[in-house]
C-alpha cells in the first residue's frame, strides 16, 4: 500500500510538471480555448453542438467550404453609422442573424474567414454579445486544405437556434472613453495598422489628419500570424510581441482604421489572458472628431 501511494504521488507530480511544459511549448490549446486546431475541428465535424461559420465576401463559400460550415457574408456583421462604415449592428439584428445560422446559447461557434480579420471581427462581435463558447480556427480554410481535409460546395440544412444576448459593453472602447483614460498606466493602446499609417506617412483616405493616437504603440496585426498564412504564431512568440508593448496586467485597447484589423489583435490579447477592448470606430472616428494625433515613431 505504501508503495502504491508513492507511485500515485509521483504520477501527480509528473502531471503537474508536464502541464506548464505543454503551455510553454507554444502549442495552441483545444477544447474551450479561443483558438482551436484543424485536427480538433476535424474530430467534431457533424457534432450538433458545434457550429462552423465561413465568413467571406462574394462567392468564396460556394467555391469550397468545410463540410457543415454555414455561410456568413461579412457585410452582415457590420453596419454604417454616423459616417463610420464598419460599426457593430444592433443586438437584435445580430441575434436574428446568428439564430438563422443555428447558433444557440450552448453552441460552440468556430469561425474562419477569407482573411483572418474577417473571422476575428465576428469573434469580437460574439464576445460583445456575451457568447462565451467561441473559437478561431487556427490556419483557417487554407490550412484545412493544405492538410487534404474534405471540402464541399453543399449547403447544410440548418435548424434555427435560440440565442440570448448578454451585452458586454466593457469590450468596446469609444472616443469619449479613450479621452478619459489616455495616459493611464493600466491602459495599453495598440495601433494595429501599417508603419506608414502609424507614422502619418500613409494615405489619409479623406480624413483631416494622419498619424496615431497619443500614447499608442504599434503592433501591426500581420505580425501575429506566420508569414503568408492564417496560422497564429506560437503562444510564446505572441507573448513576447505583447510584452514589448504592454505592461503586465494592463488592459489592451486596440484600434486600426475602421475596427477590422484591430479585431485580430483584440482576440490574441484575450487569448494571452489580457483584459481587452477594441475601439470600434478606430482612427476613422478619432480623425473625424478632429481629436489630437501624433506623427512619427514616438508613441
Task: List each model region and its residues.
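Bacterial N-terminal signal peptides
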Residues: 7-19
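Active-site neighborhoods of enzymes that stabilize oxyanions during catalysis
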Residues: 27-37, 43, 78, 141-214, ...
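Thiolate-centered catalytic microenvironments shared by cysteine-dependent enzyme domains
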Residues: 86-181, 202, 211, 261-282
Amino acid at each position: 500500500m505504501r508503495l502504491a501511494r508513492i507511485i500515485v504521488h509521483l504520477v501527480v507530480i509528473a502531471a503537474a510538471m508536464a502541464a506548464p511544459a505543454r503551455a510553454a511549448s507554444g502549442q495552441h490549446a483545444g477544447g474551450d480555448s479561443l483558438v482551436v486546431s484543424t485536427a480538433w475541428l476535424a474530430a467534431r465535424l457533424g457534432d450538433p453542438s458545434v457550429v462552423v461559420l465561413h465568413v467571406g465576401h462574394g462567392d468564396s463559400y460556394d467555391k469550397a467550404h468545410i463540410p457543415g460550415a454555414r455561410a456568413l457574408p461579412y457585410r452582415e456583421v457590420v453596419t454604417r453609422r454616423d459616417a463610420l462604415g464598419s460599426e457593430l449592428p444592433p443586438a437584435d439584428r445580430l441575434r436574428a442573424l446568428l439564430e438563422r445560422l443555428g447558433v444557440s446559447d450552448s453552441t460552440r461557434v468556430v469561425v474562419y474567414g477569407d482573411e483572418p480579420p474577417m473571422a476575428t471581427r465576428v469573434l469580437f462581435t460574439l464576445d460583445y454579445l456575451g457568447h462565451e463558447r467561441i473559437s478561431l480556427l487556427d490556419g483557417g480554410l487554407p490550412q484545412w486544405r493544405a492538410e487534404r481535409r474534405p471540402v464541399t460546395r453543399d449547403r447544410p440544412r440548418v435548424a434555427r437556434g435560440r440565442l440570448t444576448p448578454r451585452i458586454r459593453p466593457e469590450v468596446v472602447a469609444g472616443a469619449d472613453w479613450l479621452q478619459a483614460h489616455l495616459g493611464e498606466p493600466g491602459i495599453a493602446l495598440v495601433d494595429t495598422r501599417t508603419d506608414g499609417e502609424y507614422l502619418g506617412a500613409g494615405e489619409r483616405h479623406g480624413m483631416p489628419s494622419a498619424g496615431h493616437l497619443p500614447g499608442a504603440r504599434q503592433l501591426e496585426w500581420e505580425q501575429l500570424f506566420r508569414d503568408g498564412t492564417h496560422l497564429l504564431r506560437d503562444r510564446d512568440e505572441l507573448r513576447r510581441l505583447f510584452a514589448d508593448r504592454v505592461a503586465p496586467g494592463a488592459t489592451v485597447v486596440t484600434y486600426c482604421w475602421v475596427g477590422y484589423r484591430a479585431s485580430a489583435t483584440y482576440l490574441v490579447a484575450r487569448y494571452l489572458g489580457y483584459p481587452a477592448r477594441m475601439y470600434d470606430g478606430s482612427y476613422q472616428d478619432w480623425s473625424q472628431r478632429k481629436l489630437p494625433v501624433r506623427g512619427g515613431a514616438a508613441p
